[in-house]
């Protein structure tokens, strides 16, 4: 079971109840936790390794280094990680070298104690640059204070064009049915041709696979280039999103096992354009999933990360962990970004086979989506749309 995906159940069901759009990046969350684990020991390390599915920290770092190499080879994706360290803290050399080699994270010295807002502005500049200006002011003034000692941050920017673009003259305005029974008229992308699609009638949903163009770093189409796609999961019932999300996060490899295996005629084929951002309190969700030690001032052991130069020396715990994501889907393609950050502060002491037959696919009520690299089976983003007219 991918415990990072479990976060989507806790945060996603809350968003469904609030009738809010939602997206998070399991890849960004995993990267943030893996970097944190490098600086932990004892029960804190044990919990993080168990949560991330690794037997040993060396195994986790090797997997992180492999994933970092893969991401650097994906032209559609850029990834950056940073460690923002207060002047009262010295990073341990082993943590610093492993963070750079396995996680691509490099330290920057800041003054949280005396210039917390200036430090926040520097973290914001890092995130904005890494997301090509899509995420600005992620850290609000007042988020950091004199008790903030270290911030671990990562940011990811994904931008890809459709392998077969939607024509703007085919875009139609039609009604989208919200969960509360109200309706809103929004533009729908339309392409009534053959698509990779599947029906899972017994489980109550359909899946549409929309391919992104396979390009190399030179911007040209290359066979053998990374294979990205968006999977749109449409519940057959208008109120079926919660049940669908439950399957997605509890069934092993659910998202990847639902990838359609064959093309078929899909008419009509319509998906609304959407654009929104969402935020996640990862600390609260992770604690509910049993990962509590890093966030407990009495139990956290971040002793392999840094040494305090203060007298008496201070121990650290993770006082906050948050993620912000944004996505835009239109006729040209998709842009999706994420930023995940952790604040370290001192303590005080597979589904059934689908039935191949002609089908329609009109996403006119709440649906789930995933952006994946399907040859490596990596889920970059997972989210749902409750109201495509809401851009907040």
From Swiss-Prot:
Region span, RCL: 333-357
Recorded family membership: Belongs to the serpin family.
Residues at the site labelled Reactive bond: 347-348
PANTHER family found in the cross-reference section: NON-INHIBITORY SERPIN-Z11-RELATED, SERINE PROTEASE INHIBITOR, SERPIN
Single Gene Ontology MF annotation: serine-type endopeptidase inhibitor activity
Protein name in UniProt: Putative non-inhibitory serpin-10
Stored InterPro entries: Serpin_dom, Serpin_fam, Serpin_sf, Serpin_sf_1, Serpin_sf_2
Gene3D superfamilies: Alpha-1-antitrypsin, domain 1, Antithrombin, subunit I, domain 2
A Pfam family assignment: Serpin
CDD domains the UniProt entry points to: serpinP_plants (cd02043)
């Amino acid at each position: 079971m991918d415990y990072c995906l479990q976060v989507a159940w806790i945060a996603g069901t809350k968003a469904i109840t609030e009738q809010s759009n939602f997206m998070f990046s399991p890849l960004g969350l995993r990267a943030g936790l893996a970097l944190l684990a490098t600086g932990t020991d004892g029960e804190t390390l044990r919990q993080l390794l168990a949560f991330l599915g690794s037997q040993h920290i060396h195994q986790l770092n090797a997997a992180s280094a492999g994933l970092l190499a893969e991401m650097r080879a994906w032209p559609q994706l850029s990834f950056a990680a940073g460690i923002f360290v207060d002047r009262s803290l010295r990073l341990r050399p082993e943590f610093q070298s492993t963070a750079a080699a396995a996680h691509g994270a490099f330290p920057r010295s800041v003054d949280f104690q005396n210039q917390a807002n200036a430090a926040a502005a520097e973290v914001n500049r890092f995130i904005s640059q890494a997301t090509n200006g899509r995420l600005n002011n992620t850290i609000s003034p007042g988020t950091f204070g004199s008790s903030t000692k270290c911030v671990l941050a990562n940011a990811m920017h994904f931008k890809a064009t459709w392998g077969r673009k939607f024509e703007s003259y085919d875009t139609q305005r039609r009604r989208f049915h919200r969960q509360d029974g109200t309706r809103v008229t929004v533009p729908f992308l339309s392409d009534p041709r053959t698509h990779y699609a599947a029906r899972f009638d017994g489980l109550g949903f359909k899946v549409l696979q929309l391919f992104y163009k396979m390009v190399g770093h030179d911007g040209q189409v290359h066979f053998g280039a990374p294979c990205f796609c968006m999977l749109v999961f449409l519940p057959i019932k208008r109120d079926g999103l919660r049940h669908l999300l439950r399957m997605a996060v509890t069934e092993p490899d659910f998202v990847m096992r639902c990838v359609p295996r064959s093309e078929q005629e899909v008419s009509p084929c319509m998906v609304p354009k959407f654009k929104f951002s969402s935020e996640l309190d990862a600390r609260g969700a992770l604690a509910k999933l049993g990962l509590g030690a890093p966030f407990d001032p009495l139990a956290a052991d971040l002793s392999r990360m840094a040494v305090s130069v203060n007298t008496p020396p201070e121990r650290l715990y993770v006082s906050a962990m948050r993620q912000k994501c944004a996505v835009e889907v239109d006729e040209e393609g998709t842009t999706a970004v994420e930023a995940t950050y952790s604040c370290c502060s001192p303590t005080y002491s597979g589904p059934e086979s689908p039935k191949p037959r002609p089908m329609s696919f009109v996403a006119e009520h709440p649906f789930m989506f995933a952006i994946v690299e399907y040859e490596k089976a990596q889920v970059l983003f997972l989210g749902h749309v409750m109201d495509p007219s809401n851009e907040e």
